[in-house]
Structures are given as structure tokens and as C-alpha cells.
Amino acid sequence: MKRQFVHTEDGSTTLYVPALNEHYHSIHGAIQESLHIFIRAGIEFYLQTHSTGFPLSELNILEAGFGTGLNAYLSLLYAEKQKIRLQYHSLEKYPLTFEEIQQLNYKTQIPAKNPDLFDRLHTSPWETENLISPFFRLDK
């Protein structure tokens, strides 16, 4: 499948698929979109509304479409910061090539103690559970 790189308004990259006339993330900001929708309105909202007097320490996530790995990367960084164990399941029909992954600029756009974790998400084997960090397991 042919994909083109697009720089979004927040400076991050995303992909565009001409055959589908579809972007992987918002052209107004890939990182901003993922932070707002996946982290704040997703994970944080769930943790705030499903706590029963005790903070949740573990969460399972299913993502349909691993894509650029941005949602998984932000979730991983969130889990590390909040010390919450995430079991992350992701499906992907058209995985990115190594060359495409290297052209994404998330490691330079998102401050992280260990930006190499982004590469681990992408280089971990498919169809198996992968321990990416003590707080993040990936099954893709």
C-alpha cells in the first residue's frame, strides 16, 4: 500500500494513503490528537471514572490499527510516568516498513527519558506478547 509522509500543524509527522484518501492522524497535529483523544479522553478519563476508592494499577487496551505506533508510544510513556501496568493489544493489517518507521519524528517531538522505547514497539515480534517495560506489555 502506497503511503506518503505529511507534516502536521504541531510539527509531528503522519501518513496519508492516497488510495483511501485517508490520514493516519489529524493534519492539525498528530501528537496533539493522540494526547487529547487517546490519553486524556481515553485512558485518563477511564481511570478517573472507574476508580472504586482505590486507584487502578492495571489496564487492558485494545487498539484496532497499530499504524504509526503513536498511540501505543504515548500510552507507554503515560504508563511509565503514572506507574500503571498496561496490557496493550493492537491489530494491524498493513504494518509499516522499517524505513517508514525511521521517518516518523515522534522520538524528537515527544520528550522522553528513553526515546528508544518507540523503536522497541515497532521491532518487537508480531503475534506474541512483548514486555517493552515493567509497566507495558504489547501484544500486536
Question: Where do the PLM segments sit?
Answer:
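Rossmann-like AdoMet
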Residues: 1-59, 76-110, 136
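Aromatic-residue hotspot detector
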Residues: 38, 66, 91, 118-119
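Glycine-rich SAM-binding Motif I of class I
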Residues: 69-73
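Conserved beta-strand/loop positions that form the S-adenosyl-L-methionine
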Residues: 62-64
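S-adenosyl-L-methionine
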Residues: 100-140
